[in-house]
């Protein structure tokens, strides 16, 4: 089983910090180590700690993360569980050495249709971001 799937399964079942499948500096220069350290090491850790402090003695104590997010009413348990899930999915989607550098399939077709090429898309995207 790959690291991403294993980490996600462990996190969902036990409300633990997911293990990143890359070093904290592996995404530089796109995402800095400082950003990873702050958002992974502080934000996500705080949400995990909060959730683990909130669920004991509630109906959510033995439930997995997805079930908590799907069934908890608005409030602290729902918010922290949702943040754990969102942050985990965010961090686990990245790879320091992507297997492909350009989109494929329907996304590639839409980019080519709307921008002419992936290079043109990147130029326009970067210009719009400034």
Write out the residue ranges for each language-model feature:
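Positively charged n-region of N-terminal signal peptides that target proteins for export
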Residues: 1-4
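Feature for soluble, non-membrane regions of globular proteins
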Residues: 6-130
């Amino acid at each position: 089983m790959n690291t991403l799937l294993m980490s996600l399964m462990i996190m969902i079942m036990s409300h633990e910090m997911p293990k990143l499948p890359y070093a904290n500096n592996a995404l530089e220069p796109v995402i800095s180590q400082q950003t990873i350290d702050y958002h992974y090491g502080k934000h996500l850790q705080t949400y995990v700690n909060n959730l683990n402090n909130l669920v004991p003695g509630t109906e959510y104590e033995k439930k997995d993360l997805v079930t908590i997010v799907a069934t908890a009413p608005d409030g602290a348990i729902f918010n922290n569980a949702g943040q754990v899930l969102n942050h985990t999915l965010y961090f686990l989607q990245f790879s320091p050495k992507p297997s492909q550098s350009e989109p494929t399939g329907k996304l590639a077709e839409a980019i080519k249709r709307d921008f002419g090429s992936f290079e043109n898309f990147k130029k326009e995207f970067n210009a719009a971001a400034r």
